[in-house]
UniProtKB/Swiss-Prot annotation:
UniProt keywords, alphabetically: Porphyrin biosynthesis, Transferase
Organism lineage string: Bacteria, Pseudomonadati, Thermodesulfobacteriota, Desulfuromonadia, Desulfuromonadales
Cofactor(s) of this protein: dipyrromethane
Other known facts: The porphobilinogen subunits are added to the dipyrromethane group.
Protein name per UniProt: Porphobilinogen deaminase
Length: 315
């Protein structure tokens, strides 16, 4: 095996660097003598911070520039948050390794430690995701949802500076940054179903790069990968992205995959939710079937109102 350094491309935020450094440490421990270097890359999503993601448009806002670095050979491996990765990869790139998942739940952070049930009438809640907005408003139509962009530290600061009653973030990011003590409440998946791939990392490389594939193989977690594959099949069928309030979460136990999915109106007025279970070997079929069930129950109308056309099923 070549002794040249393995170059990991990553976004430059503190959380993204933590994730890439975790992979770096794992690889250097697994392969003594291997040099792993990080290559921070600024993405379009990092540059545009004054516009809600749903209005920026497009997919891959936090990965495209990193994938371009894979294409041109300036990096060997990309470390992504799986929830940022579009459901269809560019030709020639693969996601062969998904490590064990961190906590997939959303978390409520409040200045005074209040729980969701204790939030006052008309509370101002910050979030960047239509998915969260729709689910929170479905339960609490009185809430005033404030668009909130930026990295974890920026969002925590804005909560204080802009006098918000709370913000909703991914629990995984707070835990990885050792900020779990800021969490007032872990929101159950019944209250806020997570984003596709939330809490999971994705390691992306060039197809046929045998050296990189061999190096990262020990980090792969089969159960996490099966769950994420099902979630991404759901996302792919519904042609989802930042502009669509949809969510899905799959779990694996005793070779059975159980998956919950939903599609909602942005204002939370209508929310369609279903659960399916099947053997893990049928993971992608479960994701597609769950999407079909929601479409038949009215999700097609919600998507049409957002000018989103579901991806046709491949025979």
């Amino acid at each position: 095996m070549s002794s040249s350094a393995l170059r990991i491309g990553t976004r430059a935020s503190r959380l993204a660097l933590w994730q890439a450094e975790w992979v770096q440490q794992q690889l250097e421990t697994l392969h003594p003598g291997l040099s792993v270097v990080l290559v921070p890359i600024t993405t379009k999503g990092d540059k545009i911070l004054d516009v809600p993601l749903a209005k920026v448009g497009g997919k891959g806002l936090f990965v495209k520039e990193i994938e371009e670095a894979l294409y041109d050979g300036s990096i060997d491996l990309a470390v992504h948050s799986m929830k940022d990765v579009p459901s269809v990869l560019p030709p020639g790139l693969i996601l062969p390794c998904i490590p064990p998942r961190e906590d997939p739940r959303d978390a409520l952070v409040t200045p005074d430690g209040r729980s969701f049930a204790q939030l006052p009438q008309g509370a101002r809640i910050g979030t960047s995701a239509l998915r969260r907005q729709a689910q929170l408003l479905h339960r609490r139509p009185d809430l005033d949802i404030v668009s909130l962009r930026g990295n974890v530290e920026t969002r925590l600061r804005k909560m204080e500076e802009e006098d918000m009653d709370g913000i909703v973030l991914a629990a995984a990011g707070l835990k990885r940054l050792e900020l779990a003590e800021r969490i007032a409440e872990y929101l159950s998946v019944d209250v806020s179903l997570p984003a596709i791939g939330q809490g999971a990392l994705g390691l992306e490389c060039r197809e046929g790069d045998d050296r990189t594939l061999e190096l990262i193989a020990p980090l792969h977690d089969a159960d996490t990968a099966v769950a994420v594959r099902a979630e991404r099949a759901f996302l792919r069928r519904l042609n989802g992205g930042c502009q669509v309030p949809l969510a899905a979460h799959a779990t694996v136990a005793e070779q059975t995959l159980t998956m919950v999915g939903l599609v909602a109106e942005v204002d939370g007025g209508s929310l369609i939710k279903e659960t399916l279970a099947a053997p893990v070997a049928q993971a992608e079929a479960v994701g597609c079937q769950l999407a079909e069930t929601l479409l038949a129950r009215g999700a097609d109308r919600i998507l049409a109102a957002l000018d989103i056309t579901p991806t046709p099923l491949v025979p």
